[in-house]
């Protein structure tokens, strides 16, 4: 059994350490990472991927994958405890450290203000942004169907982030700061990382690698000599 109350208390404590002030010097951002987690063997293995893209070209320069035994079952609201061990293992393998990380998941748009983007950002002390595919908490006004439509995401009077339609006929993204990024800058950075898909390029790559998707396998076959990979980890 897991002490969920103790983990929730830890979340509240760590959330108090989150900074929503920009820790990014826009003129000196050279590398942006995407981070995502998938699961193998019916959830027994956590597979984390971190993709490093050069900015502003958004060209992939490195990726790392780590597999670790899953230490926590799926518990709503405590997902970051399940995911961060594998993320830290992938982080430790990186040759190029990023200036900013976009994480597939929530930042402060979380009932206790500590989604995986915030938790991971605190642990590695790098600016992070949560880019989630669904809402965990907060309310927003109806969103127009046009590309670029945006509404603030609020919990009572506190703005947690943004709801942004990045692609037509697609569900919106839920964007919130993780750590060392302001609410306003979170949306702007995600918008700078788009390349015509629903997801920004950093998390689109990380999602494909973490889940070992067919498009990633096709890319591997076309790029067998890519220097940024760790072939033994795939």
From Swiss-Prot:
Keyword Transcription regulation: no
GO MF annotations in UniProt: deoxyribonuclease V activity; magnesium ion binding; RNA endonuclease activity, producing 5'-phosphomonoesters; single-stranded RNA binding
InterPro entries the UniProt entry points to: Endonuclease-V (IPR007581)
Subcellular location: Cytoplasm
Keyword terms: Cytoplasm, DNA damage, DNA repair, Endonuclease, Hydrolase, Magnesium, Metal-binding, Nuclease
Residues at the site labelled Interaction with target DNA: 74
Lineage: superkingdom: Bacteria
Pfam families: Endonuclease_5
GO CC annotation: cytoplasm
Enzyme Commission no: 3.1.21.7
Classification via Gene3D superfamilies: archaeoglobus fulgidus dsm 4304 superfamily (3.30.2170.10)
Top EC class for this record: hydrolase
Cofactor: Mg(2+)
Residues given in the record as Mg(2+) binding sites: 36, 104
Annotated CDD domains: Endonuclease_V
Record's catalysed reaction(s): Endonucleolytic cleavage at apurinic or apyrimidinic sites to products with a 5'-phosphate
Keyword Metal-binding: yes
First-listed, main subcellular location of the protein, grouped into a coarse class: cytoplasm
BP GO terms, sorted: DNA repair
Similarity remark: Belongs to the endonuclease V family.
Function: DNA repair enzyme involved in the repair of deaminated bases. Selectively cleaves double-stranded DNA at the second phosphodiester bond 3' to a deoxyinosine leaving behind the intact lesion on the nicked DNA.
Record protein name field: Endonuclease V
Annotated source species: Yersinia pseudotuberculosis serotype O:1b (strain IP 31758)
């Amino acid at each position: 059994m897991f002490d969920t109350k103790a983990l929730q208390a830890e979340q509240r404590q760590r959330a108090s350490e989150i900074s929503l002030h920009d820790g990014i010097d826009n003129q000196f951002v050279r590398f942006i990472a995407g981070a995502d987690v998938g699961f193998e063997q019916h959830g027994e293995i956590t597979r984390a991927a971190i993709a490093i893209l050069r900015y502003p070209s958004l060209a992939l320069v490195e990726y790392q994958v780590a597999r670790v035994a899953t230490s926590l079952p799926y518990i709503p609201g405590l997902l970051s405890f399940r995911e961060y061990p594998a993320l830290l293992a992938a982080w430790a393998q990186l040759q190029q450290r990023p200036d900013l990380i976009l994480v597939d998941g929530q930042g402060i748009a979380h009932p206790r203000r500590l989604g995986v983007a915030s938790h991971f950002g605190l642990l590695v002390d790098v600016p992070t942004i949560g880019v989630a595919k669904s809402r965990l908490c907060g309310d927003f006004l109806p969103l127009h169907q046009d590309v670029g439509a945006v509404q603030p995401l609020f919990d009572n009077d506190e703005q947690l982030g943004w709801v942004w339609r990045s692609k037509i006929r697609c569900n919106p993204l839920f964007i919130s700061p993780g750590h060392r990024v302001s609410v306003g800058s979170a949306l702007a950075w995600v918008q700078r990382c788009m390349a015509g898909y629903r997801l920004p390029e950093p998390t689109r790559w990380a999602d494909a690698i973490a889940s070992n998707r067919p498009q990633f396998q096709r890319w591997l076959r076309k790029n067998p000599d890519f220097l940024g990979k760790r072939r033994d980890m795939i």
